[in-house]
Amino acid sequence: MKITYKSAGVDVDEGQRAVQLMKNHVKSTFNSNVLADIGGFGGLFSLNIKDYKEPVLVAGTDGVGTKLKIAFMMDKHDTIGQDCVAMCVNDILCQGGKPLFFLDYVATGKLVGEKIAQIVGGIAEGCRKAGSALIGGETAEMPGLYAENEYDLAGFAVGIVDREQIITGANIKAGDIILGLPSNGIHSNGYSLVRKLFFEVLDMKITDYVEEFGTTLGEELLKPTKIYVKEILSLIEAIPVKGISHITGGGFFENIPRILPENVDAKINVDAWQIPPIFKFMAEKGNMSKDDIFGTFNMGIGMVVVVSKEDVNGAIAVLNKAGQEAHIIGEVVEGAKQVIL
């Protein structure tokens, strides 16, 4: 019996076909700093640092978690890549990092060229929104490790910031104002709880229309994570921003304290913005306490920005001009690095 790589479950030809199908998506993210075409052993990116006194690279990596299961259930793969980009670039934004380039990793049980091209198309869309070049990636076919129709997805973002412009939160003090930037739904965390509630406890189907959402359950759950790059960079250029927090896993209680000094609390007014129906629905149907749901989900606020009281009106004006809605959702008070609802 003749043994081949294909008979072992790895189709090299299909991998090459996938590269051809995704090529235009990848190239659509290129800019003049990209020095190598697709297919090299490494991505090459020329750093233009003439505008930086002491340039510092900022790097972040993340995945999409079990939101992938929603994409599998819907057989819709063209937006999940944007989630991956958003999770990475929004993180490096928190320290003032301007995204430069991105790399992706896709691993699957059985490689299907069209599906990979859809995934990479979503990654490319996210990169264009973030102003980031997609300069490299890996697509791995791993039979026996992943189910045939499933895949995992991870991304890696690198950005740049001037050392003296790094945002740390160290200068946050009592009296500062907390701004909230609306999310686009659940974003990309908490989906193990989401799936348990909707598909096990409530026994709902992905195709069910939910009146409160104005759409099907699947469409609501697969809304792509918002990318805040252009809006936040506009703000940083105009206003001395003291702290930025990306509200992801752990919700308000884990992410906001990451930027707080030891001697202050973040006092949040939960009536300051309209909490989206998806979160109200989950809180009611899942019998979740306020602490539970605010400690898991973004509750309609994807990014938190801290500025001084005298800069708050200017900050809101800059964000609004960039097309970004912003709410005053709280203030910094004396305390012990806690979030108070």
UniProtKB/Swiss-Prot annotation:
GO terms for biological process: 'de novo' IMP biosynthetic process; adenine biosynthetic process. It is found in: Cytoplasm. The keyword Nucleotide-binding applies. It comes from the Bacteria. It holds the Pfam family AIRS. Its EC number is 6.3.3.1. The keyword Ligase applies. One of its GO terms (cellular component) is cytosol. One of its GO terms (molecular function) is phosphoribosylamine-glycine ligase activity. Pathway: Purine metabolism; IMP biosynthesis via de novo pathway; 5-amino-1-(5-phospho-D-ribosyl)imidazole from N(2)-formyl-N(1)-(5-phospho-D-ribosyl)glycinamide: step 2/2. Its main location: cytoplasm. It catalyses: 2-formamido-N(1)-(5-O-phospho-beta-D-ribosyl)acetamidine + ATP = 5-amino-1-(5-phospho-beta-D-ribosyl)imidazole + ADP + phosphate + H(+). Keywords: ATP-binding, Cytoplasm, Ligase, Nucleotide-binding, Purine biosynthesis. Belongs to the AIR synthase family. This is Phosphoribosylformylglycinamidine cyclo-ligase. The gene is purM.
